[in-house]
Amino acid sequence: MSEATAATVALGKSWSVYLVRAANGALYCGISDDPLRRFDTHCSGKGARFFHSSPARALVYVEACASKGDALRRERAIKALSKRAKERLLVGVPVLREVGEPAI
């Protein structure tokens, strides 16, 4: 375990994946160890270039993850979802399968 990782574990620093809704209705997905602070950064016009064309309007989803690596993997999975699937995620309906995907 690296010194930085040990310090993170000692401080109880946790990572989350989050979704922010932009003014145009688009959803932005990211990770942070402090989603509320990161949302404030997005709202202030700093942070992701995504919000240059349409400002951040609401932090609509936060999911705690066990590690930064887990948060990155979950972010990638969420970004791969269709807009419709992301919207279902927001209302708590699990995405079991996308249209066109083979049954597992």
From Swiss-Prot:
Entry-linked PROSITE patterns: GIY_YIG (PS50164)
CDD domains tied to this protein: GIY-YIG_UPF0213
Gene3D superfamilies associated with the record: GIY-YIG endonuclease
Pfam entry (one): GIY-YIG
Record InterPro entries: GIY-YIG_endonuc, GIY-YIG_endonuc_sf, UPF0213_domain
Transmembrane stretches, start-end: none
Residues covered by the GIY-YIG domain: 13-88
Stated family: Belongs to the UPF0213 family.
Protein name: UPF0213 protein PSPA7_1257
Annotated source species: Pseudomonas paraeruginosa (strain DSM 24068 / PA7) (Pseudomonas aeruginosa (strain PA7))
Taxonomic lineage of the native organism: Bacteria, Pseudomonadati, Pseudomonadota, Gammaproteobacteria, Pseudomonadales
